[in-house]
From Swiss-Prot:
GO terms for molecular function: ATP binding; ATP hydrolysis activity; DNA helicase activity; DNA/RNA helicase activity; RNA binding; RNA helicase activity. Belongs to the DEAD box helicase family. DDX56/DBP9 subfamily. This is ATP-dependent RNA helicase dbp9. ATP-binding RNA helicase involved in the biogenesis of 60S ribosomal subunits and is required for the normal formation of 25S and 5.8S rRNAs. Residues 587-599 have a biased composition (Basic residues). A motif (DEAD box) lies at residues 184-187. One of its GO terms (biological process) is maturation of LSU-rRNA from tricistronic rRNA transcript (SSU-rRNA, 5.8S rRNA, LSU-rRNA). Coiled coil: none annotated. PROSITE patterns: HELICASE_ATP_BIND_1, HELICASE_CTER, Q_MOTIF. The Q motif is unique to and characteristic of the DEAD box family of RNA helicases and controls ATP binding and hydrolysis. The gene is dbp9. It is an enzyme of class 3 (hydrolase).
Amino acid sequence: MKRKLDANDVPSPEAADDSVKNDVDNLDFESLNLDPRLRQALVKEKFTKPTLVQAKAIPLALEGKDILARAKTGSGKTAAYVLPILQTILQKKANDPSLKATTGLILVPTRELAEQVQNVITTFAAFCGKDVRSVNLTQKVSDAVQRTMLADYPDLIVSTPSRVIANLGSSALSLENLTHLVIDEADLVLSYGYDEDINALAKAIPRGVQTFLMSATLTAEVDTLKGLFCRSPVILKLEDKDDQGSGVSQFVVKCAEDEKFLLTYVIFKLQLIKGKVIIFVGDVDRCYRVKLFLEQFGIKSCVLNSELPVNSRLHVVQEFNKGVYDIIIAADEQEVMGARKSKKSKEAEENDAGEAAGSSDEDEGEAQKPSTTRSDKPSEKRRKTAGKDKDYGISRGIDFQNVACVLNFDLPTTSKSYTHRIGRTGRAGKTGMALSFVVPADQFGKHKPTSFPTAKHDETVLAKITKRQAKLGHEVKPYHFEMKQVDAFRYRMTDALRSITRLAVQEARAREIRQELIKSEKLKRHFEENPEELRQLRHDDELRSARIQPHLKHIPDYLMPSKGKKGISSENVGYVGFRKTSENRIRKAREKNRGKGKGRNYAGVKKVDPLKTFNRGRK
């Protein structure tokens, strides 16, 4: 079709955008010519229309083209590469039913994301019988078991780069027949310290492999991966309505360090936020401090702890998605506690042209400020990170469903991390809210028990967050609490915080790890042979993580604001006794010892009358 020329004899711009959008809106999975078994699985999962990234990427993938796609996490990127790969595998099996070869490799940065991708593959291959076999190499199984799993040549492998290299080195895995390579969350793979593994993998992969690079941002790491694996890829910079973040309302509250706990208590106890909430904090200790604090008021929550096994963490996410818990507390340690980053990432961390998101120098400064304080104590950093799962990550990739609010209890150290955190809510066209606590510089360090080092730079980081969000067309608005009404709850917050000591936090962490040891399948036989060790793990009654005060669970009417009384019905308030449910341990011990003759209560000692008894008093 010919286009009209303007006054300068230049063709007028094509009005293709609207037509493309209309084509995407009218497109359905039937028109993609997928295998009937895949369409049946899509119908079962109630997938009616493809998302923007699926509508764009799937036809290109079926044509055999390399794809570099930038789309928001939660936009359907996983299905965009899983469906074409499954389609290709089914076509090959139709031509040669006896074919046994590993043709697809999916690389992800974290174990949680690997499990999530594996579940998606299982869902879409539900009606394919034995024609499609996939293996997740990040599972905690022995090398011998993994070798057995790989000996049957599964069609698809989901793994982190380090596990692939380990199995290539032991000759358990062969990539000779590989036809599809996917690197999901490509901008994170190098940031998580997989540089050497990726370079080794680039040499092991045969030429002509179709490559998918899926990423939320186009950074220096993505350019590096594109140079290693892609052949003139089709670049998709997809800006859906959801990608603009229009559904997320962003608010910030400036408060003192102890007021973070006070406001958190008021928010959840008065039910100011309805629905599921993710609370992001600075580290694991902080997770348990917040959890124990909420427990004082009868508010249930769960902790996503990087020290626990991957299956336990996945179970926590599943329980949260099912609605068992409405509050999940997480420490995004890869970003907050200092993830290993490549030089290119540090130099151009925010040079994402598609997002127009500020200069790299800004975020470099953001990342360096907290790190300078940590670098003064290298031994402490090594001790803290020891035992943490390298493949752990929370703010990216994990599919948290129906999150109403993201609460940044501790502000992240970079604006990029902030963007990824708030991306957990307002997904798939839904609305959401992000609320961040910011400690002013003059308030930092005034309440030592609740202080956190990175809060020193909160105002600087907030300025950069505001600037970045403004460039993206979003506004970070101030949120004001009526402090006169909030202050009425302060004494209850103080009572609760007083019982949550550093020792209580350590005991809570130790107890959860002991519970995981008891649940461990691998240790069951060991405990059967050594029942005494199991008994020691279970009998931990003396470890009281925090003194529970039952009266804190109930809010008296005189404390309730007039508007708050309507929000909480009397049906939700259970019986709360005004007497202590357990005796005073110290008083009970004194009485017991007094009966045994241990210690003397001089005020209560009766004088011995020698005329009434033959027992002489002690000289």
